[in-house]
Amino acid sequence: MMTENDRDALVDFLARHVDTQILTHAEVSAFLDFCDFEIIERGRIIADIGEVGESLYFLLDGTAELIVGPTTNEVPVGQIHAGEMLGEMSFFDRQPRNVRMRARSSVRLLRLPREKYNRLRLEHPVFTVLLLEYAIVSLDHLYRRTSTDVAQLNQYIHSMSG
């Protein structure tokens, strides 16, 4: 359940992470009516391999990890930090997920279900464009972190063989 204090904090959060200069405080607050507020405990699965994304997630607090492989042999391949979006790839391309998203710590997030996103597109198209920009920036952050990790691993492997 979202309290008024949560709502005010979320409006402030969105103002820090989305270009809200073209939106009023009331429009940002109205966006929250399309979202569900959730708290996911450490170690819980947010979205699993093989599922088709039916929601976008906005990580407010905490850290989530991206994992591949069966639960008996998991390999972490990335992290999502507060202020970033989760689940955008499967949500937009409607393909099954190839990574598991798990709460690395207790996380607070906003969930935007597909049916509410579709309504948001019609009622607030400007906000939808901002969400797409936000998705691109979140994917860019993930790609850059992952590229850096792969480069460091590659450098380490070459230093060990040389």
Task: State each model region's role.
Residues 1-162:
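Cytosolic regulatory regions built on CNB/CRP/Popeye-like sensor folds
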